């Protein structure tokens, strides 16, 4: 494309979308924030395969501050009269702090495919079995592991549009029984939306015929709760509460696995989410988890350790993943709200 053609394209695109605030934010993130952050921050972050763990429990899209409020000190930050910063909840885990150590670490991505690519796309991990509710594992690095257990295929709940935590926990225990000599990665879909218990926050702005949720013809219609917040369709407190409820939903299963499975377990996240924070160098508010945005709310994630008897680990080589049904993967990603 020539420079003149590029200018014409930009002008036409601006003319067609100038009144769509969602489009403007996306273009700012893609064309300004992302290149600047790539230049200044790169994709530096914790090398997951090289880190010290036997069992890695991944909470998809869980901000560090949300995790700290809900999982540390028995979830006291989600309880109480005013519910603290993240809303009023009465079903958080009780008891003492379940972790032996805790810190924040920097993730190698601000969205799941970026995190997967940054950690696993270039390697072979024959000592690891990946149990995942997130279909991106098949698309990005499905052949990198000894086995991938695709819970998004076997236990997708069409009524809620996601994989429930208990299905992932059951698959993880089965993998543990089958592979006592392998590292385990257990990737829950929560805290990523859809928000369990909040069907009115599904936002069906995605047509069933669209692939990976390409945009509607109607400008400014929200496709997900983050866009709905950006457009003023829901208030910040309501979204934060639903987001926190997803942590409440997944935490019992995540903590049970971390404490029960043999080995040094770590509970972490692949990325966080923005709820209107501003990302340098532009003053515009951003929402959700745009790729390549290296702001703390997105790339600072929890790293909570549960020490246990170490797991004997043996590398038996990687296995080729059965060719994923691309249409099925696309549909699962669409139902989970992903858009490319």
Q: Locations of the language-model features?
A:
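Catalytic domains that recognize anionic headgroups
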Residues: 1-340
